[in-house]
């Protein structure tokens, strides 16, 4: 309804489609949530599903509501479904037994923003993934032996986890996977400003190819430490060596 106020996405549309197909779906269609669709009541939308797609059964999330009237209870949707010859199912609630709360996108976003990658991945059931194109940076990492690829996620609205250093697996353009250490933050050691733009940059361990202009993806495995400011580049280099070892043995 208000794209500028929508929460950040946990997965891009293309990856959602691939995931749904891997789960066994024969057909996937993304509906344009325009004014006409927004105005439909629950009954009108279920009727559309029957008439346009021949839907015989509809699965709803345990706390999901839809339609301009947002009916309050699953029984209301079941009643509409019976009148249209559609069986309505409600998915069971999944709970995070560590946090003692339902697993939902809001809980996952909260964990990612706080840097709690292990909890986020546990709730997701897979490592959180971020992808984008590699753009030119200042190339300062090369001068201390840790070249980095600066990732531009573009306008994908993908959620970027909280600032810090992370152990990641990097999916390279050729499909190969290499371990990496990734920094999210404002690079206080070299930029010296709290107003510096947020950067996402990854060092691919043991790899020296050219990635500029190519698309890569990173899968978050664990958080290594907070981002912090070092007194000089030698101190930064020493810490990066330790971070590299931590990334190698992560997970």
Where on the chain are the PLM-derived regions?
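Phosphate/ribose-recognition catalytic cores of enzymes acting on nucleotide-derived substrates
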Residues: 137-251
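N-terminal alpha-helical segment
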Residues: 29, 101-104, 216
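A non-catalytic, amphipathic alpha-helix used as a structural packing/dimerization or gating element
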Residues: 15, 119-126, 235-246
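Glycine-rich, Lys/Arg-enriched anion-binding loops that position phosphate/diphosphate groups
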Residues: 81-186
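Residue-level signal for inorganic ion chemistry
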Residues: 20, 58, 120, 168, ...
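Residues at the C-termini of beta-strands that transition into short coil/loop
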Residues: 32, 92-94, 222
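N-terminal Rossmann-like or analogous alpha/beta NTP/dinucleotide-binding catalytic cores
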Residues: 1-84
């Amino acid at each position: 309804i208000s794209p500028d106020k929508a929460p950040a996405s946990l997965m891009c549309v293309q990856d959602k489609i691939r995931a749904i197909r891997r789960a066994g779906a024969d057909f996937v269609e993304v509906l344009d949530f325009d004014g006409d669709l927004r105005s439909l009541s629950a009954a009108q939308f279920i009727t559309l599903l029957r008439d346009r797609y021949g839907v015989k059964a509809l699965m709803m999330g345990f706390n999901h509501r839809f339609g301009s009237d947002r009916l309050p209870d699953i029984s209301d949707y079941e009643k509409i479904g019976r009148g249209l010859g559609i069986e309505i199912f409600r998915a069971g609630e999944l709970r995070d037994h560590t946090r003692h709360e339902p697993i939902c996108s809001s809980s996952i976003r909260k964990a990612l923003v706080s840097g709690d990658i292990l909890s986020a991945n546990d709730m997701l059931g897979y490592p959180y993934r971020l992808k984008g194109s590699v753009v030119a940076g200042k190339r300062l990492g090369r001068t201390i032996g840790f070249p980095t690829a600066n990732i531009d996620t573009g306008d994908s609205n993908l959620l970027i986890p909280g600032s810090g250093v992370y152990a990641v697996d990097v999916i390279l353009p050729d499909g190969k996977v290499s371990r990496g250490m990734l920094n999210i933050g404002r690079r206080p050691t070299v930029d010296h400003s709290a107003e510096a733009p947020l950067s996402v940059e990854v060092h691919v361990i043991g790899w020296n190819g050219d990635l500029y202009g190519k698309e890569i993806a990173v899968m978050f495995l664990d958080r290594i430490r907070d981002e912090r400011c070092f007194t000089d580049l030698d101190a930064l280099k020493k810490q990066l060596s330790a971070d590299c070892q931590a990334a190698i043995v992560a997970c």
